[in-house]
């Protein structure tokens, strides 16, 4: 709802991490993207994009990027045609090769934790040296630093920063978790540019 969107966005901005993927599996996802995009101080994208219609709707309400759980060529091609960054989910070498054929160099590794976590990144990175990954699924404060320290990782995605208990506690609770993630990123030697 609007109040939760405001708490999350306010907390991320205050915590120095003004980037948010809103999962469209939430019935309020499109409205949240529209509300947060209108603020202008948060880079907001649509997550769990499953088809071209969701992609179109997300772009219409202001999504600056799209993330999909899998590699769907139609979604990737439509996003690239629209000039919007797209991060499709991959888990296997075949998925990664399909992404490379579509011109992608950055891919969401999903579900990272269930698929082997850092061991999977270690196995895939030397085979695909031109690809950078965003682990998602099973990422937490416990393993965030290990992921971000890996040169094949450009970002990580997780819901712990905006967990329901933090949202209920307010923007400062979200900001505290965001600050912790920013500190982990810095400790891992990852600047904002990677």
Predicted region positions:
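CoA-thioester-processing core
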Residues: 79, 86, 118-128
């Amino acid at each position: 709802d609007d109040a939760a969107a405001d708490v999350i966005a306010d907390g991320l901005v205050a915590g120095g991490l003004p980037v948010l993927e809103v999962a469209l599996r939430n019935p309020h996802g499109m409205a949240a993207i529209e509300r947060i995009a209108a603020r202008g101080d948060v880079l907001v994208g649509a997550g769990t994009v499953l088809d071209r219609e969701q992609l179109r709707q997300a772009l219409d309400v202001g999504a600056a990027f799209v993330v999909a759980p899998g590699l769907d060529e139609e979604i990737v091609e439509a996003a690239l045609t629209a000039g919007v960054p797209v991060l499709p989910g991959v888990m296997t070498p075949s998925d990664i090769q399909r992404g490379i054929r579509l011109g992608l160099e950055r891919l969401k590794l999903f579900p990272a934790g269930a698929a082997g976590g850092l061991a999977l990144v270690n196995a895939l990175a030397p085979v695909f040296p031109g690809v950078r990954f965003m682990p998602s699924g099973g990422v937490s404060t416990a393993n965030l630093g290990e992921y971000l320290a890996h040169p094949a990782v450009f970002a990580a995605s997780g819901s712990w920063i905006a967990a329901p208990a933090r949202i209920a506690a307010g923007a400062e609770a979200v900001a505290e978790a965001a600050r912790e993630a920013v500190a982990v990123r810095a400790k891992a030697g990852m600047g904002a540019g990677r």
